[in-house]
Amino acid sequence: MAALATSQLVATRAGLGVPDASTFRRGAAQGLRGARASAAADTLSMRTSARAAPRHQQQARRGGRFPSLVVCASAGMNVVFVGAEMAPWSKTGGLGDVLGGLPPAMAANGHRVMVVSPRYDQYKDAWDTSVVSEIKMGDGYETVRFFHCYKRGVDRVFVDHPLFLERVWGKTEEKIYGPVAGTDYRDNQLRFSLLCQAALEAPRILSLNNNPYFSGPYGEDVVFVCNDWHTGPLSCYLKSNYQSHGIYRDAKTAFCIHNISYQGRFAFSDYPELNLPERFKSSFDFIDGYEKPVEGRKINWMKAGILEADRVLTVSPYYAEELISGIARGCELDNIMRLTGITGIVNGMDVSEWDPSRDKYIAVKYDVSTAVEAKALNKEALQAEVGLPVDRNIPLVAFIGRLEEQKGPDVMAAAIPQLMEMVEDVQIVLLGTGKKKFERMLMSAEEKFPGKVRAVVKFNAALAHHIMAGADVLAVTSRFEPCGLIQLQGMRYGTPCACASTGGLVDTIIEGKTGFHMGRLSVDCNVVEPADVKKVATTLQRAIKVVGTPAYEEMVRNCMIQDLSWKGPAKNWENVLLSLGVAGGEPGVEGEEIAPLAKENVAAP
């Protein structure tokens, strides 16, 4: 297969794109906890109906096709999330956060929930199930193995294969999508095709008994929640390899877009590598005006994911509106999403990890009643830590983010000189890692204003927490932002946000109540528009003038009283998934998350 840029960042130009089961899979599945191995034919014909129930296993119907591993239930859904990232084990951005936080909230509402993701590293808490499956890849078969751990009410399933594990080493050099930022592995198409097919096997062949309420396989009455381009073909595999053979008859798929800019565009000639029937080719077919990964006709995984899913979602209502608004913000798939429809649900956040009343990284812990004084003390500690003059009366602006075009670090860097001319006294702390050119921009700002600006261009989780607690204003200069997590973290710590008016920032930040809006910035990642620089500088000036006033103290309180947990979003997700009408699916019950987020070794960008 030719060299491919599988997660190529899509720019904004016009485009025109809108057998036998054994051929695809051999079912060499070993049963977990002593279950007998199934022959290929038995595995293919097995129809389970595992339902969420209080560990009550009924006997199989005599004379029917149902095996002994049948669990019936009175409530709840079987939900299987599939994604390339799953925090805290693997994460490069919002996708990992969602698959880390949303599933436990769904489980707390009484649903049986699984997440399937690659095993990029030797995760110390994931155990070998001894269950294997052979997946059709190209002209041969690849054997995958399933690892499992049960955390916060969720079955975390890791697909083990050298295509995943051999790319990631230790905690500092691991790369999920490519060896360096902006460069993809040549075989990403094969890697994530393997993930999709393995994820479809997991609910049927894994007999999981860790949950105190559910036992046995998940069965076939399942809702698969696919996430981003890496899972685009899953619906096609479901239809061609299973439903056409009477398996997963009532299963449904939802496809969630976390970032439309990464679509999985490949050479059109690579379609046969997917081992899908010709009837799905039109769903992948795509033409754009770019030379990467090849010039001309391509296949587009995200396009197929959108068209073949039963429901399409994204991570905020305003981002959903932006995606269908035109080519520029819909990245050439706007016409497809107008056809299918799209639902936006704002993300939550992990309120146990980001909690100023318990945060071990900050100098002074606080809640809403003590926030104003505590934040002043934390500011002084932050100033001392980064080497700025210690003075609680100097407004402190912070920027935290990945240093890539989406987050607008170049716009922020360009706005700093203007802001310094407009405001007599201000300090700025910049934290982030990413592309070297952006790192140099931030360091250059520090060199130009050594007594007022500090740039930290390395990963530092402790400093990120300290900045949230000590900053007066959080600057978010995103060109586009599907949902955004940084502003939620800021509000959790009582730090109002000065943000671009895009995506989830519009849905979560209220002008004058919890932050300040700059207006929409240009999505052209190749230039820094002077008008955008002015928007950033003038909005930060406006925010700085409010710092220290009664109005600002009220904003701090407004931020901290927000419910930013996954509880509300999980209920919205439940309503959408129930609308798919999967057999046996019923509303869950409201509950609390089972345990705080575990801290494990993670795979990072």
Curated annotation (Swiss-Prot):
Pathway: Glycan biosynthesis; starch biosynthesis. This is Granule-bound starch synthase 1, chloroplastic/amyloplastic. Required for the synthesis of amylose in endosperm. Belongs to the glycosyltransferase 1 family. Bacterial/plant glycogen synthase subfamily. It holds the Pfam family Glyco_transf_5. One of its GO terms (cellular component) is amyloplast. It comes from Zea mays. Residues 1-72 form a transit peptide. GO terms for biological process: starch biosynthetic process. ADP-alpha-D-glucose binds at K91. Its EC number is 2.4.1.242. Its main location: plastid. InterPro entries: Glyco_trans_1, GS/SS, Starch_synth_cat_dom. GO terms for molecular function: alpha-1,4-glucan glucosyltransferase (UDP-glucose donor) activity. It is found in: Plastid, Chloroplast; Plastid, Amyloplast. The keyword Coiled coil does not apply. It comes from the Eukaryota. The lineage of its organism: Eukaryota, Viridiplantae, Streptophyta, Embryophyta, Tracheophyta. It catalyses: an NDP-alpha-D-glucose + [(1->4)-alpha-D-glucosyl](n) = [(1->4)-alpha-D-glucosyl](n+1) + a ribonucleoside 5'-diphosphate + H(+).
